Structures are given as structure tokens and as C-alpha cells.
Amino acid sequence: MSEIITLSYGSICNNTVTHLYNTQESLISYTPSSKPNHDLQVFLTRFKSTSVSYSPRALIYDLRNGLGALNKYEYHETLPVDLNFSLLSTNTTAPAGAETGAGSSLESGYNLKKSRVEKNEYQQKLDQGVTDGSSLNVNNTKYWTDYNKLIYNPKSLTTVNNFVHNENNHESGYHYNFNSLKYDSFNIGQEEFKACNNGNGGYGYDDNDNNKSIENFRYFLEKTDRLQGLQLLTNLNDAWGGFTSEMLIDLIDEFFNNTSSDKQNLWIYGIMNSTKLSEKTQSIRTKLSFIKTLIELTKQSSLIFPMNLNNSKDESWHNNYSMLTDKYNSGSNWHQSSLYATFINSIWGLNNQLKNQISMTHLQNDIVKLNPNQKIINQIKIKQEKSGNGDKQNQLFGSDLNQFNLKDIVNLKDLSNLGKSSDTSATQREINLGISKNASTNTGNDAYHNFVQNRISSSTSQNEKMMKDKEQEQNGIINNYLNPYIDNIFQVETFPVDILKSSSNAINISTEFNVNDGLKSYLKPYIKLVSNIRNQHREYLDIIEDKEELLEDLNNISQEYSYGYESDDEDYE
């Protein structure tokens, strides 16, 4: 047995792991005669009891009030002796717009009590042993605990005290005593981790345990027989990135200091909470915080998968080539996180399927075999596979032919192909999760140069077709992986399956995650932005710390993703 410990930080990431662990729960066999297809103990810990009972092998971090209706000791008989029961029984917060400051009623941060969040209908039925996801919607899934199925060990759940969860999921959390101070930048996350862990200037964690991060990780580490690696999910565009970076420094120093970097499996799924703001309309402060987070986490990890659901400016969520239906709500963390989870679940399936199991070490070696410094997976896609010999026009334009209009014809590169089956990616439904979007938009070229291409699909026939297509391109290393259960996440009753288009009442997908030269084009405006920061920009320098070091890191990574001759190389000097 080879275990994986998962660490997740913040609301959008915790929603994502909830989808993932609900999928793991669906794999549990409750009858002795059932034959398992997965090694559940890769991601789950089995309880010592007469019944089959599992708990996530995970550390979950959230802001104050971020657990919603869940009391982390609710399903456990005993409470810790030193628990501050006032924090357990009530959620306290200073709401946005409330008066704060010295002498105010909110000075301590504990004087104003918020009414307890009630369990939704799904959780009430789940407590009665009934699993019915039909009641779930965007209005009653404000918290990841609203549709969580597994019972967490109390040591898994940690909330910080200094910042409060914002019920508007697209806005950053705020300081409990100074609501104008947002939990939105790398340096604030760094400061919060230090405050929580040394007690200076803060109240620490929810139970005032200033050593909690190290000791709780140690608890789960000691429960493993043979650690396969760590998989972290964190937000790249708020303060959780800085919090994660500081925690990694401590964890690596305490537990992995004697492990060489090439033998350490430390993956980060960097998630960007999709907002109404495009990358072009984000503030300088937001952009600097993001790029600082990306660079620091890249240096600390062995692989990083940055993901961003904001499509490039010329793409539409609901065009005929998208997998998304008009029921998709970008303002819902339940919806948004399900797409990130769909991709990650394809990898989790490789990690714990009993047949053709692919370990973290195996997959990591395949990806970095050409260049160990190419650790950023910059292109990530979920693709919908065509099923059988179905209607060719349905395959081309979607299941609803009534949606076909003149705009669809204009989008076609070749009108002679109208109504014909096509194997090109332009006519295949997909969701682009990566930070490198459309090649022609970002670079002016028709395609990126791929250094390494990776694909996970459910059948060998799909892999053979992909291999044939990619061989014609003669473009980098190609890795194909088989996961027959890649679609199992759609069978879980808590997954919002109606946001995805289906073909013949089935959703057949494959996933791709590639390393290509698109990252160099992506980093170019950030290099220019950092270069223009001056010494008088104190607010910006607080985020990026050492400007010259950040520029050097950016240029070094950019060069690792260069291919061929580029006339504008001087832009990177």
C-alpha cells in the first residue's frame, strides 16, 4: 500500500476536494461479495471498527465560518479537554460594513455572534441514511460542507481565526476586526500563517493551538505505511497561496529536509477562483500577487497544475464546441469546483486503480523526463469523446440542432465540412482549464510546440486514435494512460451533471495536460509588469518582496519553455 496525503486551502479548493472525496466514497463496497477496482486506502484512512468506514487522509484549511453547518466534532463522541467551547457552538464575525476600531463593540472580534448555519435538506437526509442529490442547487450549496458525504477526523479540519469567510464566494474573506483588510494577497497569507503558528499578533487557529499545522500533519504521516507523496490544492489568486507557501517551508524543513527534490512527489493543483474580471481588468496588485504565488509554489513543488476557468476573450462558455450547458453558473463554487475536480479525478483514478495503477513517481517521471525544470503543466483540457457512430451533425454542433445558427457557420474554417464528421479539436467539445488558452490568440501561431503531451482516456481505442493523431504532428513526447473509470465522478449524486452536455445520455471524456511553449507567451506581460515596479510602489513591493529575484525566476522559467528562434527574445532580458 502506498498512500497520498491531500492538503486543501480555502473555499474553492475545499469544494473541489469534496467532489473528489465524494467520488472516493462512491467506490466503497458495502457488501463482502463486491470486487473492488480501486485501492481506497491511497486517499482514505480506514476506521478501526467492525463496519467498513473510511475518512479522508487530508488536512483542510478554511477561514472562520468556512465550515458552514458542520461542527467538526459532531460525529465524534469526545471533545478535547482544552477546546474553547464558545468557538465551537457559535460562529462569530464582523459583517461587511460593520463599525470597527478601538472602542467599538467589535474590538475583540468575539462580541458579535452570527446565527448558526442550518443544515440543508441534503445533509438532513444524509444523517438519516438517505442519499438524494436532487435537492441540491446553487442556492443551498454555499459551503462545501453542504454536500460533503464522508466524516472527517477532527484533526483534518482547521479554521484560521483572524479572517472571516465571505458568503459571496467571489469576494475575498476579510479580517474579523477590520473588514477593509481583505484576505486577497500573497503577503497577507504569509502573515496569517505566521500569526496562527507563533501566536504573535493573532489568535492562532480555531482552538488556539499554535503548533497545529506541524502536529496534525505528523499525525497523518505516522498513519501511513509508505508515503507516495503530497497533493495540495490551493488558490493562486488570493492569500491562501502565501499561507500555503509558508506552510510548505515548515513541512519540508521538518519532514522532507533529507529528501532530494527529484525523489520528492509534491504536487500542487493551483486553482484560480473564476471571477467576472478578466485577466486584463484585474488590478496590478492582484496580478502581482498571482505571479508571486505561482513562482514561489513552482519552486517548492515537483509539479504544479495551474488552472483557470476564465476563458480567453474570443471564446464563449456556451458555444457549440463547449461542454457546458446554459445551466452552468460561474458564480457557484459548487459548479466551478466540479470542473476542476473532473480533471483531478482522472489522475486520482490512475493513482489508486488496482489494474494499470500509475503512481505519482511514475507519472512525474514521464512528465519531466526531458527537462526536470519544466514543472508547470500549462495546458489542461477536458474533452468530450464522440460516442459510437451517432449523428454526425450532432457530433459537430451539439445534441440540440435547434441551437444551430449563422454564427456557427461563420465559425467554421471550411464550409465544405458542414455535416461531416471531423477529428479536429475545433469541432470537439472541450473545457480549457489551463493558463495557456488558444494558441492563435496568445502567440499568433496556429499551435503551440509541445514538449510533453499527456492524455488519460477510458479505452485503448481512444488512446490509439490519439497516438495516431499526435504522431502526425511529430511534436514532443506523448504519454497515454488508461483509466476505465474516468467518468465515475458523473455518477455521484452530488455532482451537478446538468451543467455538462451529453451525447446519447452519456458523458464520455478524456483529459489532456501538456507542457508547451505557450507558457513563455503567458509570462511575457508579467515580466513586463514586474519590471515596471518602482521603489516608491511600497504596496507592490510588499507583495513581491525582492523584485530582482522575482524577475530572475520569471526569466529563468520562461527560457525553460522556449522553443526555436524568437525575434523578441530581448523582451525577456
Swiss-Prot record:
Localization: Mitochondrion
Predominant location: mitochondrion
Keywords from the UniProt entry: Mitochondrion
Superkingdom, natural source: Eukaryota
Biological-process GO terms, alphabetical: mitochondrion organization
Gene Ontology CC: cytoplasm; mitochondrion
Keyword Ion transport: no
InterPro entries in the record: DML1/Misato (IPR049942), DML1/Misato_tubulin (IPR029209), Misato_II_tubulin-like (IPR019605), Tubulin/FtsZ_GTPase_sf (IPR036525)
Keyword rRNA-binding: no
Pfam families, A to Z: Misat_Tub_SegII, Tubulin_3
Entry-linked PANTHER family: MITOCHONDRIAL DISTRIBUTION REGULATOR MISATO, PROTEIN MISATO HOMOLOG 1
Annotated function: Involved in the partitioning of the mitochondrial organelle and mitochondrial DNA (mtDNA) inheritance.
Similarity comment text for this entry: Belongs to the misato family.
Protein name: Protein DML1
Native source organism of the sequence: Candida albicans (strain SC5314 / ATCC MYA-2876) (Yeast)
Gene: DML1
